[in-house]
Amino acid sequence: MDTIAARALTVMRACATLQEARIVLEANVMEILGIAINRYNGLTLRGVTMRPTSLAQRNEMFFMCLDMMLSAAGINVGPISPDYTQHMATIGVLATPEIPFTTEAANEIARVTGETSTWGPARQPYGFFLETEETYQPGRWFMRAAQAVTAVVCGPDMIQVSLNAGARGDVQQIFQGRNDPMMIYLVWRRIENFAMAQGNSQQTLAGVTVSVGGVDMRAGRIIAWDGQAALQIHNPTQQNAMVQIQVVFYISMDKTLNQYPALTAEIFNVYSFRDHTWHGLRTAILNRTTLPNMLPPIFPPNDRDSILTLLLLSTLADVYTVLRPEFAIHGVNPMSGPLTRATARAAYV
């Protein structure tokens, strides 16, 4: 299936180079399009030309690219347009070994397949405590009953620790059961002035220490902590104290947008508004997948099918921009006039 996807990507990118009718095509583009169009016309009985000039010819070439995108992604889009019918035989065209594919396309598909079939350490973009259901007021003393050291969450990436005079305790527990981190990078600081429960202000005296695995860590410096070693805080002073611990970032096996080069840009290209026809076409295609149909996904996609669909659909969007096809989509009423931000914004409502 990787070679099928690589051929589809190669052919669509070759079509995206046809930005004017009299352009001098590169030799490899002529070879790719010559073989691909010949095989496609033979199996589908369509009349795609290598140099489309009329609207009908541009439509035919775009429909060929649409067929290839759907076949490579394994999507059966169904009846979405009175002007277009998906040719299921296109998969046979893409399976033809005579159609060459570029090194770039092959490498990109190999990256998609390789990265989605395994896991690796990645810097996560969200706060470590993002999914915490409750939070506490920052800078306000809080001590649970029968405790001398109490740690609470006070933000999506922050905890604060209240300590009685002379108290020592391990706050590792508050990090457990969250996000399955491989390494946590944190910074600790003394809260110079904090409010007691009664509302009066109190100072954290110098001398409070934070240690990882028994080694004291300097305040205001990034500490690499594996989440397993003891994270102890000691208040040797004779009055209450408070400490703030910020998770700068953490590394885990969760997939991110860095798993594939320019995945963020590909997603933006897919979900961008070009006109109402593209908006309806993209929505109809993504309705047959697990991806959202109008707005980008909340979390990075982590399976091969989703990322491959985004890559192929982004390339199809480029072809749409170049060929400027005009056809109808069921349920879509094209609007005339120039494209404005207000027009694009209204399409997502």
UniProtKB/Swiss-Prot annotation:
Residue spans crossing the bilayer: none
GO cellular component: viral envelope; viral outer capsid
Keywords of the record: Capsid protein, Glycoprotein, Outer capsid protein, Virion
Top-rank lineage group of the source organism: Viruses
GO MF annotation: an example: host cell surface receptor binding
Keyword check for Glycoprotein: yes
GO biological process, one term: fusion of virus membrane with host plasma membrane
Glycosylation positions in this chain: 287
InterPro entries assigned to the protein according to its UniProt record, in alphabetical order: Capsid_hemagglutn (IPR008980), Orbi_VP7_capsid (IPR001803), Orbi_VP7_capsid_C (IPR023178), Orbi_VP7_capsid_N (IPR023176), Virus_capsid_a-hlx_vir (IPR008935)
Keyword Nucleotidyltransferase attached: no
Location in or out of the cell: Virion
Family: Belongs to the orbivirus VP7 family.
Assembly, per entry: Homotrimer that assemble in a complex of 260 capsomers on an inner scaffold composed of VP3.
Purpose of the protein: The VP7 protein is one of the five proteins (with VP1, VP3, VP4, and VP6) which form the inner capsid of the virus.
Name the UniProt record assigns to this protein: Core protein VP7
Native organism: Bluetongue virus 1 (isolate Australia)
